[in-house]
């Protein structure tokens, strides 16, 4: 059974005299810094000199300094920058300040799990990973609630790594909802698997393949877009609220019957075998090695994949149709822009 922890099991006083450095001020960094500060903790934000976020930190009323300065001042250093780049950032600016007894924290285990960051033996290494985007972590906290989180300890040099991580989670508001204890390996491997097989890779490929099937059969691309992409949100929202059962309760009996009869034809034994191979590649480190090499080589395949999907007909049709629907709050990514 999962180990769950709540507010009454976490002691925020453990962190009252432990300065905290939040490295990065993106989605998660913004939420962590502001929530912890509002919880009465001593927070500073570490950024590169000249960072566009510098003024945002100052506007939020928080202390801001370089990454190296923040790491030197802090007892707890939470790295909240993108996975790729963390290792160099750590080696150049954080590692020199990681004296025995300090704590290095993460919100995702990629660089620890795959050996890109190897902390010294004398420090604690832990993880607090809220299961929501940063804006929601902040929004729910301000409303008096919290989002669930995962918590893990990779290295416990002081004997109090878990208790400090739990206190940190309380500072974020996460123990109001409940935090689940895991390991760096479990969090990293399941996170990558979910992204690749369902949330990003699986859903994107399914939507495109279904759209292409309808268009090739002579149906209007606009109708195919509505059926294969636009309406997906309606179903995902039902999943989010009440799981598969609530979705089936909410749709028509015809849709539910099609769910039962057609679904197994899409997810076949071959599909499940592919899922197992994807998981094996994650567990072995093959995926991480490929992704790290891709970045070292300038991302040629990554950029080609991205451009191909930008040019896919479903994207062209989608841009046109979303202009008809201002209520969906249409967002378009400019050329050259990308996520973390």
From Swiss-Prot:
- Which EC class heads this enzyme's classification? oxidoreductase
Which SUPFAM superfamilies does this one have?
Answer: 6-phosphogluconate dehydrogenase C-terminal domain-like (SSF48179), NAD(P)-binding Rossmann-fold domains (SSF51735)
Report residues binding substrate: 252
What does the record give as the reaction this protein catalyses?
(2R)-2,3-dihydroxy-3-methylbutanoate + NADP(+) = (2S)-2-acetolactate + NADPH + H(+); (2R,3R)-2,3-dihydroxy-3-methylpentanoate + NADP(+) = (S)-2-ethyl-2-hydroxy-3-oxobutanoate + NADPH + H(+)
Q: Where is Mg(2+) 2 annotated to bind? A: 191, 227, 231
Cofactors (names): Mg(2+)
Q: Name one GO biological process term.
A: L-valine biosynthetic process
PROSITE patterns linked to this entry: KARI_C (PS51851), KARI_N (PS51850)
Keywords from the UniProt entry = Amino-acid biosynthesis, Branched-chain amino acid biosynthesis, Magnesium, Metal-binding, NADP, Oxidoreductase
Q: How is the cofactor bound?
A: Binds 2 magnesium ions per subunit.
Locate the residues binding Mg(2+) 1: 191, 195
Q: Does the keyword Metal-binding apply?
A: yes
GO CC, sorted alphabetically, is: cytosol
| Keyword field contains NADP | yes
**GO MF term set:** ketol-acid reductoisomerase activity; magnesium ion binding; NADP binding
For the ligand (NADP(+)), the binding residues are: 25-28, 51, 53, 83-86, 134
The UniProt entry, under InterPro entries, shows: 6-PGluconate_DH-like_C_sf, KARI, KARI_C, KARI_N, KARI_prok, NAD(P)-bd_dom_sf
Q: What is its EC number?
A: 1.1.1.86
Report domain KARI C-terminal knotted positions. 183-328
User: Can you give the residue ranges of the KARI N-terminal Rossmann domain?
Assistant: 2-182
Give the record's family classification: Belongs to the ketol-acid reductoisomerase family.
Give the protein's biological function: Involved in the biosynthesis of branched-chain amino acids (BCAA). Catalyzes an alkyl-migration followed by a ketol-acid reduction of (S)-2-acetolactate (S2AL) to yield (R)-2,3-dihydroxy-isovalerate. In the isomerase reaction, S2AL is rearranged via a Mg-dependent methyl migration to produce 3-hydroxy-3-methyl-2-ketobutyrate (HMKB). In the reductase reaction, this 2-ketoacid undergoes a metal-dependent reduction by NADPH to yield (R)-2,3-dihydroxy-isovalerate.
> What is the protein name given in its UniProt record?
Ketol-acid reductoisomerase (NADP(+))
Query: Which organism's genome codes for this protein?
Result: Chloroflexus aurantiacus (strain ATCC 29366 / DSM 635 / J-10-fl)
Q: Which gene encodes it?
A: ilvC
């Amino acid at each position: 059974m999962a180990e769950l922890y709540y507010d009454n099991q976490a002691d925020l006083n453990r962190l009252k005299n432990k300065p905290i450095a939040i490295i990065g001020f993106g989605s998660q960094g913004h939420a962590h810094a502001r929530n912890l500060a509002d919880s009465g903790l001593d927070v500073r934000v570490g950024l590169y000199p000249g960072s566009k976020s510098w003024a945002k930190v100052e506007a939020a009323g928080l202390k801001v300094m370089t990454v190296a300065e923040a790491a030197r001042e802090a007892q707890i250093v939470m790295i909240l920058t993108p996975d790729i780049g963390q290792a160099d950032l750590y080696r150049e600016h954080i590692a020199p300040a990681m004296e025995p007894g300090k704590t290095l924290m993460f919100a995702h285990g990629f660089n620890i799990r795959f050996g890109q960051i190897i902390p010294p033996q004398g420090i604690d290494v832990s993880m607090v990973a809220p299961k929501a985007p940063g804006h929601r972590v902040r929004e729910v906290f301000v409303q008096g609630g919290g989002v669930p989180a995962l918590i893990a300890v990779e290295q416990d040099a002081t004997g109090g790594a878990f208790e400090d991580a739990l206190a940190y989670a309380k500072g974020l508001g996460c123990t109001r909802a409940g935090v689940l204890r895991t390991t760096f390996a479990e969090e990293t491997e399941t996170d990558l698997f979910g992204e690749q097989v369902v949330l990003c890779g699986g859903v994107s490929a399914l939507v495109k393949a279904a759209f292409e099937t309808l268009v090739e059969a002579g149906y209007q691309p606009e109708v195919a877009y509505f059926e294969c992409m636009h309406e997906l949100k309606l179903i995902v929202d039902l999943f989010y609220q009440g799981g598969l059962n609530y979705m089936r309760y909410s749709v028509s009996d015809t849709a539910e019957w099609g769910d039962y009869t057609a679904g197994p034809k899409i997810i076949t034994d071959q599909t499940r075998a592919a899922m197992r191979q994807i998981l094996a590649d994650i567990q072995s480190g093959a995926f991480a090695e490929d992704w790290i090499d891709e970045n070292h080589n300038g991302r040629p395949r990554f950029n080609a994949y991205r451009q191909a999907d930008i040019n896919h007909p479903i994207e062209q049709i989608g841009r046109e149709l979303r202009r008809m629907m201002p209520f969906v709050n249409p967002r378009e990514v400019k050329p050259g822009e990308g996520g973390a």
